[in-house]
Amino acid sequence: MSHLVEPPPPLHNNNNNCEEGEQPLPPPAGLNSSWVELPMNSSNGNENGNGKNGGLEHVPSSSSIHNGDMEKILLDAQHESGQSSSRGSSHCDSPSPQEDGQIMFDVEMHTSRDHSSQSEEEVVEGEKEVEALKKSADWVSDWSSRPENIPPKEFHFRHPKRAASLSMRKSGAMKKGGIFSAEFLKVFIPSLFLSHVLALGLGIYIGKRLSTPSASTY
């Protein structure tokens, strides 16, 4: 027997079936009415119906079958791709235990170096601050222990001593007998004679020097 594919039944058939007591099944959710609604009867009823209708049965249309298969294929492919991507990402994200240990060791080394450098810097800064405090304390102690500049109560101005000048008046001969004393005359007369002799000799020498050029010109 040849089975003929019948298109979807019209709406009035559904109403008739509902009146007869047959309830059509709702379409599957998410398929957007891509399947044809078929009334579900018992096996005997179906056989009788097939006999009455001359071997005709309600089957899904080719377009609805094609759309349903495509949707199933797409859903399966999407599900498989999601699983493969999640597995790949989990494999990539989870490092091996050796690499994890190396990373942890490197991080600990970097953190220990950072802490050591920070501790050294803090020690140096603390030493500088202590030295500055010591210097400030020394300056304060020096300033407080210095003697106060208290001026004396009485001022006495003293003139500097003059150097003794050489003069005949302050000589011993003048003090004893005056100008006409023997000691004064012994000193004064020879000095006077020597001064005159020197003046006379200097005059004669100058006169001779002046007379010689005039005679040579003639």
Swiss-Prot record:
| Gene behind the chain | Bnip3l
Regions of compositional bias (Low complexity) in chain numbering: 41-50, 81-96
Pro residues composition-biased segments: 1-11
Q: Which residues carry this modification: Phosphoserine?
A: 61, 116-117, 119, 165
Give an example GO cellular component term for this record: mitochondrial outer membrane
Q: How does it assemble?
A: Self-associates. Interacts with BNIP3 and STEAP3. Interacts (via BH3 domain) with SPATA18 (via coiled-coil domains). Interacts with PPTC7; this interaction promotes BNIP3L degradation.
Q: What is the annotated localization of this protein?
A: Nucleus envelope; Endoplasmic reticulum; Mitochondrion outer membrane; Membrane
Q: What is this protein called?
A: BCL2/adenovirus E1B 19 kDa protein-interacting protein 3-like
